[in-house]
Amino acid sequence: MSLSNKLTLDKLDVKGKRVVMRVDFNVPMKNNQITNNQRIKAAVPSIKFCLDNGAKSVVLMSHLGRPDGVPMPDKYSLEPVAAELKSLLGKDVLFLKDCVGSEVENACANPAAGTVILLENLRFHVEEEGKGKDASGNKVKAEPAKIDAFRASLSKLGDVYVNDAFGTAHRAHSSMVGVNLPQKAGGFLMKKELNYFAKALESPERPFLAILGGAKVADKIQLINNMLDKVNEMIIGGGMAFTFLKVLNNMEIGTSLYDEEGAKIVKDLMAKAEKNGVKITLPVDFVTADKFDENAKTGQATVASGIPAGWMGLDCGTESSKKYAEAVARAKQIVWNGPVGVFEWEAFARGTKSLMDEVVKATSRGCITIIGGGDTATCCAKWNTEDKVSHVSTGGGASLELLEGKVLPGVDALSNV
């Protein structure tokens, strides 16, 4: 899925117009301080383009966290983002304390030329996602008439619409698909992300290696299935490897992650790999722990020895890392989605860190390396490798759905050309 048949910002006339732009400012925060501004920085080129080309105003809207339709300004306000954006743009940013309603509409109706406005968190309104929870935590659904009113109010804030929120492109939320303006264009970040994935999946360099980690097989079935039609090699690591190893090798896995549902289709996936000539690499040894805890006692195990009862595998061992390194060395293109161990904890980070080192090495010899967002992007931030790989996606769920071969609603909703 690419933007080849969709309107993009570089083809949009913004002169004298109010641009309402959906961005993804869902950034990690600690004590109201932004801990990683990657997503804010990523939106700057689109914002600057509008200002440089004479836009009357740029009105930015985003979500932050999961307030589930309840206003929680103490916990999920976008106000800290306004300050960060001001320093990145080098100009004032007007922060509004809501995203819809008459006060917001008035503030956005006729601003001074070149004004940048940031709206408060879209998800303080249940009409953004269509469902949420009330103040007591009970599930609620938004009323259709109120969803229409919410979308109509957002549509009044601009003359043209730009969507640069790749990280939310897989969500059919009001701000993604419900703004009713004659021209709806994809921003530069959206374009960059989609072009990267389109080229990787539609005309890959070969050998093409997928590295798939993470916990549950069931969550990754569609991903594995779709990638088996595209890649030459696949590393299956992380927690989901135990389900494969138990089914295929009858390995004793102790209390390691085991996915009952996913186990049912392991053999089908392996048969498909064989039919398509895809070489699969699974881990052969492990760093184990006596409990799921950062300070657990650690041990070693192999597929042959098995993991003893009461113990669990939380990282791959050095022999596995060697096998992974060999696969990486053969590749001319790599897509990596999901860590291969509990990288957040020092004792179980070595497998993912040594794999990252190999991927960085591969990049420097000309291999195309794409990191699907989410946890793997967090690894890049942790080890400062964001500029040492070809592309770090800003969207975990969105990149996953592209790799699964799905159509993204936020892209589908843009104007055709």
Curated annotation (Swiss-Prot):
Query: Which residues are recorded with the post-translational modification N6-malonyllysine?
Result: K131
The record's annotation in InterPro entries points to: Phosphoglycerate_kinase, Phosphoglycerate_kinase_CS, Phosphoglycerate_kinase_N, Phosphoglycerate_kinase_sf
Identify the GO cellular component terms for this protein.
cytosol; extracellular space; membrane raft; mitochondrial matrix
Which positions form S-S bridges?
none
Q: Kindly provide the PTM information from the record.
A: Phosphorylated at Ser-203 by MAPK1/ERK2 under hypoxic conditions, which promotes its mitochondrial targeting.
Q: Which residues take part in binding Mg(2+)?
A: A215, A218, D219, D375
For this protein, the record's Pfam families field holds:
PGK
Protein's cellular compartments: Cytoplasm, Cytosol; Mitochondrion matrix
Q: Which residues carry this modification: N6-(2-hydroxyisobutyryl)lysine?
A: K97, K216, K220, K323
Family in the record: Belongs to the phosphoglycerate kinase family.
The EC number on file is 2.7.11.1, 2.7.2.3
Q: Which CDD domains match?
A: Phosphoglycerate_kinase (cd00318)
Give the residues the record marks as binding AMP.
Answer: A215, K216, K220, G239, G313, E344
So where does CDP get bound?
G214, D219, G238, G338, V340, F343
Q: Please provide the Gene Ontology terms (biological process) for this protein.
A: canonical glycolysis; cellular response to hypoxia; epithelial cell differentiation; gluconeogenesis; glycolytic process; negative regulation of acetyl-CoA biosynthetic process from pyruvate; negative regulation of angiogenesis; plasminogen activation
Q: Any idea which positions bind ADP?
A: G214, G238, F343
GO-annotated molecular function: ADP binding; ATP binding; metal ion binding; phosphoglycerate kinase activity; protein serine kinase activity; protein serine/threonine kinase activity; protein-disulfide reductase [NAD(P)H] activity
Residues bound to (2R)-3-phosphoglycerate are: V23, D24, F25, N26, Q38, R39, S62, H63, G65, R66, L122, R123, H170, R171
Q: Which residues carry this modification: N-acetylserine?
A: S2
Q: What's the name of the protein?
A: Phosphoglycerate kinase 1
